[in-house]
Amino acid sequence: MQALLCALAGLALLRAGTGEWGQGPRDTPGRRAAESPSSPGDLAGSPGCDRHAAVQRRLDIMEETVEKTVEHLEAEVTGLLGLLEELASNLPTGPFSPKPDLLGDDGF
């Protein structure tokens, strides 16, 4: 999929440079054929493809960082809830010390 996107980005850059999508004059077929790459592998080095690949790498790194952060926060919240439940269960019950509702289920 990435190779296809790079190829499309390269074609878009080639067409924009030769006036296909821009406002410049259209080139003759012979000149356009001479300027176009001879194989699809040549498109992999185009600036648009390089930029796309760099952005994709940065997005992958950001996604991995977010996933690790979420996993860490889930573990922290689970640990804190466990501590709160343990504290709530260890409080003495009696007429002057009602069991507090630490999780907020009092129907406020």
Swiss-Prot record:
Coiled-coil ranges from the UniProt annotation: 54-91
Entry comment describing in which tissues the protein is expressed: Highly expressed in placenta, and weakly in ovary, testis, and lung.
Subcellular location: Secreted
Domain of life: Eukaryota
Chain intervals for the UniProt region annotation (Disordered): 18-49, 89-108
Sorted UniProt keywords: Coiled coil, Secreted, Signal
Signal peptide: 1-19
GO cellular component, one term: extracellular region
Sequence similarity: Belongs to the PLAC9 family.
Name listed for the protein in its UniProt record: Placenta-specific protein 9
Gene name in the database record: Plac9
